[in-house]
Curated annotation (Swiss-Prot):
Its EC number is 4.2.1.33. It comes from Brucella canis (strain ATCC 23365 / NCTC 10854 / RM-666). GO terms for biological process: L-leucine biosynthetic process. It catalyses: (2R,3S)-3-isopropylmalate = (2S)-2-isopropylmalate. This is 3-isopropylmalate dehydratase small subunit.
Length: 201
């Protein structure tokens, strides 16, 4: 998993509340267990018309936002089913950070396991960031995970809270496998000692 330390990128505004995982990645794209290739299905029912053509009104189809790495979204982002394909689709598209006032718990935790930083902010801060993100190609934010701060295009700074363990995992690029490997030496030591003390086990 790629480390997340500091990210400077275009932020796309998506001021819609209760965006569920089916909206993030429709069920038609859930037939695979691969984490790659799902970016094409991200927000498919909003990004594309019924004939498959792009919906020019959707933010990620607008000039300046096509390569957005940050999403500024409405309240309760990621609600609905627990499909892990939702963060997979975001990451495959290129989104590394989602900012909202709240997230569904399962989606929130799945983001950390896949190298995405979900940031919770107060409504007044979200409103400010939504305004910043509405500047099109100039909608650049800097997310500094080490200092837990968001720097806006006008020089303003917003601080955010984050669990120390989750922050540690993102800063060091540790998913569940990475965490296990980090403890590999301790595991080997325990197994050797256990085999010596309990050879019958």
């Amino acid at each position: 998993m790629d480390k997340f330390t500091k990210l400077t990128g275009v932020a796309a505004p998506l001021p819609i509340v209760n965006i569920d995982t089916d909206m993030i990645i429709p069920k038609d794209y859930l037939k695979t267990i691969k984490r790659t290739g799902l970016g094409k299905g991200l927000f498919a029912e909003m990004r594309f018309n019924e004939d498959g053509s792009e919906n020019p009104d959707f933010v990620l189809n607008k000039p300046g936002y096509r390569k957005a790495q940050i999403l500024v979204a409405g309240d309760n982002f990621g609600c609905g089913s627990s499909r892990e394909h939702a963060p997979w689709a975001l990451l495959d598209y290129g989104i590394r950070c989602v900012i909202s006032t709240s997230f569904a718990d399962i989606f929130y935790n799945n983001c950390f396991k896949n190298g995405i930083l979900p940031i919770k902010v107060a409504q007044e801060d979200l409103d400010k960031l939504m305004d910043d993100a509405s500047r099109g190609a100039n909608a650049t934010l800097t997310i500094d995970l080490e200092t837990k701060q968001i720097h806006g295009p006008d020089g303003g700074t917003i601080s955010f809270d984050l669990d120390d363990f989750k922050r540690h995992c993102l800063l060091n690029g540790l998913d569940d496998i990475g965490l296990t490997m980090e403890k590999a030496k301790s595991i080997d030591t325990f197994e050797a000692k256990n085999a010596e003390e309990r050879p019958w086990a």
